[in-house]
A protein has these predicted regions:
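N-terminal leader/targeting and pre-domain segments
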Residues: 2-5, 10-12, 28, 76, ...
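Local sequence-structure signature of Cys/Sec-based thiol-disulfide redox active-site neighborhoods
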Residues: 10-59
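N-terminal/domain-start segments enriched in small and hydrophobic, helix-friendly residues
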Residues: 16, 93-95, 133
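Short, intrinsically disordered, mixed-charge
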Residues: 33, 37-40, 65, 69, ...
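Short, intrinsically disordered low-complexity segments
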Residues: 48-77, 85-86
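Globin-like tetrapyrrole-binding proteins
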Residues: 80, 84, 91, 95-97
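A short, hydrophobic beta-strand/beta-hairpin element that forms part of a small beta-sheet core
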Residues: 94-111
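Ser/Thr/Gly-rich flexible loops in soluble cytosolic domains mediating phosphotransfer, phosphorylation
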Residues: 107-138
Length: 138
């Protein structure tokens, strides 16, 4: 899925990609998002990339596994009401997005909502975005 030539050069030393959904977690948050999405008033491009209507996409699970096992990059997915203070400071008002947490704990924006929208719900397109961005950061 990810081009070996680029990521084989990436020295992450424990970096984490933190995906922030534009939805709250929990029963009320999930139902609210589902109903809003159904009638067209709620949108979360990261949700479309990571999940089918029922569960996490198999291709996304494979992508997570590849990042971790081959490149040492963890993926953490959080809802808006589940963010740490540092994650909130880096992403508030910019959801959905993907943050990059460096091994020293610092966090920066990695992919914004415009870039996530460009992936059009495709795990493969998202993987290409991540690959190209990692080659810049590391």
């Amino acid at each position: 899925m990810l081009e070996q030539s680029v990521l084989s050069r990436v020295q992450t030393n424990g970096a984490t990609l933190i995906g922030v959904y534009k939805a709250d977690g929990g029963i009320i948050g999930e139902v609210s998002y589902f109903l809003g999405h159904l009638i067209g008033v709620r949108e979360c491009n990261l949700c479309d990339i990571t999940h089918s209507p029922i569960k996490k996409k198999a291709k996304f699970k494979e992508f997570e596994k590849t990042l971790l096992e081959e490149h040492g990059i963890r993926v953490k997915l959080v809802h808006m009401n589940e963010r740490t203070d540092a994650e909130l400071a880096a992403s508030e008002g910019r959801e959905p997005c993907v943050l990059l947490q460096y091994p020293d704990g610092s966090i920066s924006m990695f992919l914004d909502y415009v870039e996530l929208k460009a992936a059009s719900g495709s795990v493969s397109s998202f993987a290409r975005l991540v690959e190209s961005r990692l080659s810049i950061y590391f």
